[in-house]
Amino acid sequence: MLPAPPPSSLSDHDVVKLSTHLENKRVALVVTGGIAAYRTPDLARTLRRHGAEVTAFASSDALRYVAEDALAWSTNRAVITQLGYEAEHLSDANPFDAYLVAPATYNTINKVATGIADTPITALLASALGRVDRNEAHLLIAPTMHGTMHNQILIESLERLESLGTTVIPPRQENGKDNIPDHEVLAGWLSRTVSDSPLKGKRILVTGGPTPVAIDGIRRLTNKFTGRLGIAIATELYFRGAAVSLIHGSSGITPPSYLDHQIATSFDEYQTMVLNKLESGEFKAAIFSAAVADYR
């Protein structure tokens, strides 16, 4: 017989906290009509795990791909699909710290870039641009579409939005498509954008993992270090907004894709990578957590 799960102190809507990087940040998760909308309940939960208070705005086309109840459950609040007497797109009484448009469709991107505000979503984003212009909020968009729609019109619209202070999150490009990035990647971009940490923008070098020394063409001396500590340090710095570079000794653990990293397969490679980084003079600080070989 399958046993029942152990009891939990969490309610059905609660999430297990991963960090406080988005603590006390009000985030408008703006869901437009791309197929990637089906992933947004998990995205909302991820943002909440980092401390965000998330309100979902969904277009009618988005609700073809994701259920309104699923978004309401994942955000633990009602989904806004229409504008009423409260003028939800203005959010004057309780303004948002950031607007994350994910997925951002071709149609939505081009409408917002040209100032069209003829739907609840585009009206919300017109207001968001006004708040960005006043340095009151941040606007991030994650473009998703088939590669054939990635044309000059789209490029010019994205450049226009960037010139207005919008952060364009690079898509995960696979199989001829601009795909929505992984949830942790989106959470990282959001955290870095809203961060007020003194580490924001600082260049920091981190090392981690083993540095094997070859005995011959087959055997080598190494240790049990995995590099988890170095990855954890680099990830924390990344979420705080630092420009972090990680040199990771080859092990069974791979750093997340959003971290700028190099893999060192030997002590000699590690030494060369570290010295090259330090000689560049671009780093404000360095944290050395690698298990450097001491048996040469």
Placement of each model-derived feature along the sequence:
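A cross-family phosphate/adenosyl-ligand binding-site feature
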Residues: M1-R296
